[in-house]
Amino acid sequence: MSVSFHTQMARQEHLYKLTEEGLIVGGAILFLQGNVLNIGRIFVAPEHFRKGYGSFMMQEIESMFIGVKEITLDTPDWNIRTNTFYIKLGYTEIKRDRGLVYYSKRKLTENMIRLT
């Protein structure tokens, strides 16, 4: 994605960044539509892969948008690493289309009780 695209997303308040010691190590592009949050993209700089930043960002996103009922996202079907990552985080595959795998995670509301 181009610099101009990221600039536009930042101006529209969709772009979130993760920094460490003043350097951007990752970020996310988020779209809130009613009570559904779509994670348009989440990214970590390659030199920071496998350091827990992706998991940290996903946890923070879920905490920031605690009132949403569902979080959706997609990733390429060929990317085994990201598909495994989202499943590990509790996302459920809802469909495959045009080389993408679509995932959803429905969140419990305060009026719902999880039975264990």
Language-model regions: role of each:
Residues 34, 48, 79, 109-111:
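Residues that cap or initiate secondary-structure elements
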Residues 55-56, 63, 77-96:
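Conserved active-site alpha-helix within GNAT-family acetyltransferase domains
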Residues 74, 92, 99-116:
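Terminal substrate-recognition subdomain of acyl/acetyltransferases
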Residues 48-49, 72, 85:
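Acidic/histidine-enriched, beta-strand-rich ligand/metal-binding domains
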Residues 39, 72-75:
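Conserved hydrophobic beta-strand within the GNAT/NAT acetyltransferase core sheet
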Residues 1-41, 45-47, 58, 64, ...:
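Acetyl-CoA-dependent GNAT
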Residues 52:
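Glycine-rich phosphate-binding loop
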